[in-house]
């Protein structure tokens, strides 16, 4: 099945669609979302990170947020987040209305294989203490709960361990969670 992305302008208005790989080859601005699930523990917050599968066409074997993708045409980002949590890691218990939408940011990055990310990326978070998962090996090779301290340590020591968008997503999530407390 051919996948399409929604092309947007700098203000976030939809201006068309394009096949996903072509949009990444041309570096055109398109709609995306990043989901980051977290839980409260006695030692503080933990974040559920996925390691992208070896077979992904970019950012393979990189740690990233819980899931990320592109909404389909006429699909809101919260519904898309719920859909992709199920498709990538088998999580079915998070409903669209459980997400807190932190808004969007635009980033552009050249990737390791000549492709380019240029995304208007919505950040969705949810507090999910009890989730179980079944990994889709075409999407994810590992999934782990990470503490804030472990993420900070790894970001400082080995930033290339993570996808190019993850540090921005993580920083915006932390800012929101620290302001909310």
UniProtKB/Swiss-Prot annotation:
Classification via SUPFAM superfamilies: Nudix (SSF55811)
Reaction it catalyzes: isopentenyl diphosphate = dimethylallyl diphosphate
Pathway entry: Isoprenoid biosynthesis; dimethylallyl diphosphate biosynthesis; dimethylallyl diphosphate from isopentenyl diphosphate: step 1/1
Keywords for the protein's UniProt record, in alphabetical order: Cytoplasm, Isomerase, Isoprene biosynthesis, Magnesium, Manganese, Metal-binding
Organism of this sequence: Aliivibrio fischeri (strain MJ11)
Protein name in UniProt: Isopentenyl-diphosphate Delta-isomerase
Binding of Mn(2+), residues: 24, 30, 70, 117, 119
Cofactors, names only: Mg(2+); Mn(2+)
Gene encoding the protein: idi
Annotated catalytic residues: 68, 119
